[in-house]
Swiss-Prot record:
The keyword Disulfide bond does not apply. The keyword Amino-acid biosynthesis applies. Signal peptide: none annotated. The record marks A187, T188 as: Cleavage. This is Arginine biosynthesis bifunctional protein ArgJ. Catalyzes two activities which are involved in the cyclic version of arginine biosynthesis: the synthesis of N-acetylglutamate from glutamate and acetyl-CoA as the acetyl donor, and of ornithine by transacetylation between N(2)-acetylornithine and glutamate.
Length: 403
């Protein structure tokens, strides 16, 4: 999938380098420097074994209110999760080193890590490369940044849009990584978005929390939630547009729409790059008791190994979908349930459809991308989740991950 053309974002400088967290030669370190006065907001994993960098970011954003964040450091190859005090100390030392170089407080430095869980971060690999990486900071290195944070990803993921705030054009750009262990709750894998708009931290936090629910929280690859899920949004205020203090400000209408679009673009790229994936599937549930109920049913379908292996085998096995609907433990009206593949009814009013055509169903699911919709017949709640299939290649990738 081609990486989009992303122009410089005023107030953002980017550089990458090789810290040596991988046995083979590749760039695995990302450094971003932000202009003074940059606002930041984030959402993070609610995993019970959150990583040291997640703890650090949450603590610093709470302490500063997201005001004047100056830097972001990201490493790939070591998650620094389940590493106790040594892992936390490693993050602090990196933040201190970056703070000294950028003449800012350590609390103004955000950090994220991805890779193998249980290995303590060797922070000396990062601090030793800081002078070299800092010397290469430039405004147009978004593609390099996307590649540096990859783990099992097969392509770098980026998105870009422009919006208008009170007559001023502003830019929004982002990168993300993730291919497996994707079933986010409050965030997803790693994603970093920057804008040159001027938005107060509290408003920025409201926006990122709101649109995470409709984007990153609606995708799944394998049902496993990561220990390191992090989404950070930075606003440099360098566009010349007036500063916005409320998320509901009418002047933000276009920006809100474009921000949600960038986040959804990144989230869907994660699914399309799901480990071993050959299918991209949109699952919509209608007629549920509430949107939350619909979302739970849709996620249960999307994460069912039996459903996902049927997708891989290009088998329109609608019985497995009905099984997953019932397993969600949400209110449904059995005698009203319908299942469609695209426009083709597999089941209707609780029975196999009179229009059911096995040949047409089989032909439809041979497409690389297709849609499944379910109506559970109890209310007006609806939700959409995007997923992929589960293939032998997924097993091979994860079986060989450390070896």
């Amino acid at each position: 999938m081609p990486f989009p053309t992303i122009p410089p974002i005023a107030g953002v400088e980017i550089a990458t380098g090789r810290a040596g967290f991988y046995k083979h030669e590749r760039e695995d370190l990302l450094l971003m420097r932000f202009a003074e006065g940059t606002s930041a907001a984030g959402v993070f994993t609610r995993h019970g074994v959150g990583s040291a960098p997640v703890d650090w970011c949450k603590r610093q954003l709470a302490a500063t209110g997201g005001a004047d964040v100056r830097a972001l450091v990201v490493n790939a190859g070591c998650a620094n999760s389940f590493t106790g005090k040594p892992g936390a100390d490693a993050v602090r030392r990196v933040a201190t080193a970056v703070g000294k170089r950028f003449d800012c407080r350590q609390r103004d430095v955000m950090m994220a890590s991805t890779g193998v869980i249980g290995v303590i971060l060797d922070d000396s690999k990062i601090t030793a490369r800081l002078p070299e990486v800092e010397s290469r900071l430039k405004a147009d290195a978004w593609a390099e940044a996307g590649r540096a944070i990859m783990t099992t990803d097969t392509f770098p993921k980026g998105a870009y849009a422009t919006a208008v705030i009170d007559g001023h054009e502003v830019k929004i750009a982002g990168i993300a990584k993730g291919s497996g262990m994707i079933a986010p709750d409050m965030a997803t894998m790693l994603a970093f978005v920057a804008t040159d708009a001027a938005i107060a931290p509290a408003a920025l936090q409201t926006l990122v929390s709101l649109y995470t629910r409709t984007t990153f929280n609606c995708v799944t690859v394998d049902g496993d939630r990561s220990t390191n899920d992090t989404l950070l949004l930075f606003a440099t205020g360098q566009s010349g547009a007036p500063k916005i203090h409320r998320a509901g400000d009418k002047r933000l209408a276009d920006f809100r729409e474009k921000l949600e679009g960038v986040l959804l673009d990144l989230a869907l790229q994660l699914v399309k790059d799901g480990e071993g994936a050959t299918k991209f599937v949109k699952i919509t549930v209608n007629g549920a008791e509430s949107p939350a109920s619909a979302r739970k049913i849709a996620r249960t379908i999307a994460e069912s190994p039996l459903v996902k292996t049927a997708f891989a085998g290009e088998d329109a096995n609608w019985g497995r979908i009905v099984m997953a609907v019932g397993r969600a433990d949400e209110p449904v009206a059995r005698e009203k349930i319908s299942v469609k593949f695209g426009d083709l009814y597999a089941a209707r009013d609780g029975l196999i459809s009179a229009e059911y055509d096995e040949a047409k169903m089989s032909a439809y699911v041979k497409n690389q991308a297709f849609e499944v919709s379910v109506d559970v017949g109890v209310g007006r709640g609806s939700a959409t989740v995007w997923t992929c299939d589960l293939t032998k290649q997924y097993v091979a990738i994860n079986g060989d991950y450390r070896s």
